[in-house]
Amino acid sequence: MVRPRKSVARLHKYRPPLEGRGGKMRLDFNENTIGCAPEVVRALRRALSADRLSCYPEYEAARKRLAKFFGVRPEELVLTNGTDDAINVICQAFVEPGDLLLVPAPTFPVYQFFHEVAGGAMERVYYDENFRLPVRDVLKILKQRIRWVALANPNNPTGTIISKRDLRIMLEAAPNTVFVVDEAYYEFSGETVLPWIRKYPNLIVTRTFSKAFGLAALRLGCILTNAKVADDLRRGQNPFPVNSLALVGGLVAIQHAGFARRYAAEVCANRATLCRWLEDQEIPYVPSQANFVLTRLGPHAPAIARRLRARGILVRDWNYDPRLRGFLRFTIGSTAQTRRLMRELRQMRDLIEDRASRKDWSKFATFSATGWFA
């Protein structure tokens, strides 16, 4: 019998619910809910030629333009097939069997997935009851031989931010540990450590075009780090990491970056609107600096998600995580989409306000922008 590597055989499959999403209001995967800039669509149509499709991609000119956009040197940028691929490239370059990855929990599961594919082992530190990172606990764990640390900032699914002060403390406490700061939601938070990549040789920043820029289908991202680490990453990388159409879309998207900025501004305004409404309804939520809000709806959360789906609205049910039972994550979209979500939730008060459910809430203390709800 043909057998896979032991590290692969041990894996729990990561299979997000991707099927059957067409034609629905997609508030489940933190995508741009209105689509990319129209100039991108026009450019992609023009690029669809037999000659273009039969030719392998060229990267140097695109790398220079993207580097200029991000404010780095071309040699400090590594093109990737989205953030998932960026994590895989990092693991291929740095992870030996048995190496330890430290991640906060809960967080984006892809870090663990690719680390375990590479044969690595896990260390976790759990967010506190306010969904803040316990930095003292992190520093204790860093005294072990941690190979790398994965930090989504803002974190997914909580939307919370790790302060620059705390990031600096961790970077300086473990100079031989690789720190990957995933800034997939940078456009919604404005928080970045990208200017630090030359100061801290152990820092890697990842960015994506899948969120604010609305190019999730094209799979385009990049790794931003010092030139030495970037060169090491390219050594183990597929020589054709990004397809030509993704490059066309990405380059036109940065040329018309105002579209993404305006969309992000609308999302941030709608995020505030939704949070105020949740407070008015006394529904617990986690204050977010991303394009989503994690909300505690109680034991009937899966039923609420199913009812929303039946009405054409997709949201992410986090009930599979023991620490997030009763939580739904809502992607924030346009003003019209946000109003519709609130209207539909208002019609489900029979599930949200179930008194038996409220008793179960006493097991949880979930922070909101104005205080505690129990």
Task: Give short role names for the model-derived ranges.
Residues C268, E279-R311, F367, W372-F373:
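Conserved PLP-binding catalytic core of the aspartate aminotransferase-like
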Residues R73-L77, P97-L100, E183, P201-N202, ...:
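Short acidic capping loops at alpha-helix termini that bridge into adjacent secondary structure
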Residues E129-E187:
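Active-site phosphate-binding strand-loop segment of PLP-dependent enzymes
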Residues N202-V286:
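PLP-dependent aminotransferase class I/II
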Residues R307-R311, R316, Y320-A374:
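PLP-dependent enzyme catalytic core of the Aspartate aminotransferase-like
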Residues V2-G82, V89:
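N-terminal small-domain helix-loop-helix segment of the aminotransferase-like
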